Design a protein with these regions (language model features):
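Structural detector for helix-capping/boundary residues
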Residues: 39, 53, 66, 108-111
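Active-site-adjacent beta-strand/loop module that shapes the phosphate/pyrophosphate-binding cleft
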Residues: 15, 72-95, 106
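Conserved N-terminal beta-strand and adjoining loop/helix that marks the start
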Residues: 1-20, 40
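A short coil-to-beta-strand element that immediately follows conserved catalytic motifs
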Residues: 61-70
Length: 136
């Protein structure tokens, strides 16, 4: 997959108290690190369909997918580029539970993010996009 681009999506979800929905990754890449829910886009899926599917799989929650918040690219294996498009999403149903490759799922207050081991660059991206205030 040298030089290939792997399209992925993420969901930026906040509750009524301003907490972010975070998952603890259960598998590589980034096993044991906290991140927003998301993953690879399956063939034939739109970004919104992929966000909705990943949310159900990883958190048990259904969502309405909103606007594109931001985009990042990360190095993948064998020279691949992981192209991640992160979308706003609003919970419409379900019960929060960790599933699929998520070892844990929880609502986290912005001030508590610093206490978690978070995937590289996530805090900077969320801050740069205006999702978070001053550096947490």
């Amino acid at each position: 997959m040298s030089g290939s681009v792997i399209p992925c999506v993420g969901a930026i979800v906040a509750d009524g108290e301003g907490r972010l929905l975070m998952i603890k990754r259960g598998h590589e890449p980034g096993a044991g690190l906290w991140s927003i829910p998301g993953g690879r886009i399956e063939p034939g899926e739109t970004d919104a369909e992929a966000v909705a599917r990943e949310m159900i799989e990883e958190t048990g929650l259904t969502v309405e997918v909103g606007r594109l918040i931001g985009r990042v690219q990360r190095p993948g294996l064998n020279g691949a580029v992981i192209d991640i498009r992160d979308y706003a999403a609003t919970v419409t149903g379900g019960t929060l539970r960790a599933g699929d490759d998520a070892a844990d799922a929880r609502w986290v207050a912005p001030g508590e993010l610093a206490a978690l081991e978070i995937t590289d660059g996530l805090i900077d991206a969320l801050t740069g996009w205006g999702v978070l205030g001053a550096r947490q």
